Amino acid sequence: PATSSPGLAFLLATIVEFGEDGGYTWKDYWADLRDNDVTVTAGWSEAYEVRFSGGYGAGDLPLVVSYASSPPAEVLFSEDPIAEAPTGVIEAGCFRQIEFAGILTNAPNPELAGKFIDFMLGLEFQEDIPLNMFVFPANREAALPDVFIEHTIVPENPATLDPAAIDANRQRWIEEWDAVMLP
């Protein structure tokens, strides 16, 4: 979670699902994963491209934490044409990850920066994002490419947390995760 945005998203999803209080908390869940010899890598690339056996990696592990946009990438980049993605999306474990662009307070050209953000939010740019960044567009009017429509889903009820709660607790949660996973 400290070095990977999908890892952090998974940690946050477990906090939403199991909570911090009660008979079985997110820490208990992670302790159970640890006790079951879960493999944690330094980042998404190693996990997906090296260790995962189900995608384009030739690894030894059958499950991986990735993005809802991984199945279309598998279809698009398959060496041999395939009709169905070898990967899927488990909706119950999804956390909506949102990537931002912003203008810094003391930016030397805030007007130009604003125009660039407007450009990035425009339909042409947003419709170009899925097949280049393999993320969903922020502009709801942007059309998705067929490979996205056919090979993935947008989870209807992803886990969410108030951004202020994430900001206030992220470091503590990561430190507590470290204490559970790296005793």
Regions found by a protein language model. Name each.
Residues 1-17, 97-102:
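Periplasmic solute-binding protein
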Residues 12, 31, 46, 50, ...:
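Solvent-exposed, polar/charged alpha-helical surfaces in well-ordered, non-transmembrane soluble domains
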Residues 146-183:
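Extracellular/periplasmic bilobal clamshell ligand-binding domains
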Residues 15-20, 34-38, 53, 57, ...:
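Sec-exported extracytoplasmic/periplasmic mature domains
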Residues 13-92:
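Ligand-binding pocket segment of bilobal, Venus flytrap-like solute-binding proteins
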Residues 3, 16-25, 107-113:
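Short helix-loop capping/hinge motifs at secondary-structure junctions, enriched
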Residues 95, 101-161:
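Mature extracytoplasmic/periplasmic domains
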Residues 1-5, 68-72, 94, 108, ...:
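Solvent-exposed loop/turn segments at secondary-structure junctions
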